[in-house]
């Protein structure tokens, strides 16, 4: 069944975006709650020089279902040959290329420890989200970003030809429901514990395999 959206010229924004995917996805974004852009900042700081040469680099294939595959990133043998974004503990990485494939992960403090003090970097295909409130955990956003409704919006929002991407503006306009915001501190604590357990289990499994 076909669908259509009517927009005035003023609603198209500065870029005069005519891609139907943008507006069909935007139609799903309305509702109560806080726009993601009011909860996070998008950082684009680059890693350069010696830091880049020795950095642990996370590619989009290293992020899935909230967890970073640190062991796979550490196995990379060749130094980075292109620009990379700096990553800090507490950041939330969202692939702008394939978030609908669940390429989303939280950077726990234990990830920094596992990197042995080396700088952490990621592909420029990630949106690097940091909390607007210093020290706040963004773990509570994982079930929302990985939920069926949000995943459907992200899948519909892709724009472009050979490598379609999700627009930053649409991602930041998506609304986090009030109920989740009210319990975010407790929810983040539970999710961080579960993520730490999952990372520990993955680390133990890797050691057994490599023996």
Question: How would you name each of these model-derived features?
Answer:
Residues 95-145:
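A short beta-sheet element
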Residues 37, 43-80:
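DNA target-recognition patches
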């Amino acid at each position: 069944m076909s669908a259509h959206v009517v927009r005035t010229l003023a609603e198209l924004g500065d870029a005069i975006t005519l891609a139907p995917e943008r507006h069909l996805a935007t139609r799903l974004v309305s509702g109560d709650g806080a726009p993601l852009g009011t909860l996070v900042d998008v950082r684009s700081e680059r890693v350069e020089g010696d830091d880049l040469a020795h950095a642990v680099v996370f590619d989009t294939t290293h992020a899935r279902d909230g967890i970073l595959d640190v062991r796979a990133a550490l196995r990379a043998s060749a130094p980075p040959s292109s620009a990379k974004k700096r990553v800090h503990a507490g950041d939330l990485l969202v692939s702008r290329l394939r978030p609908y494939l669940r390429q989303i992960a939280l950077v726990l403090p234990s990830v920094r420890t596992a990197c042995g003090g080396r700088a952490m970097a990621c592909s420029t295909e990630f949106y690097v989200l940091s909390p607007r409130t210093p020290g706040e955990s963004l773990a509570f956003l994982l079930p929302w970003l990985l939920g069926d409704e949000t995943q459907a919006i992200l899948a519909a929002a892709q724009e472009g030809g050979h490598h379609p991407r999700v627009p930053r503006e649409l991602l930041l306009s998506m609304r986090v429901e009030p109920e989740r915001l009210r319990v975010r501190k407790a929810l983040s604590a539970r999710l961080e514990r579960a993520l730490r357990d999952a990372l520990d289990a993955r680390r133990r499994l890797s050691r057994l395999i490599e023996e």
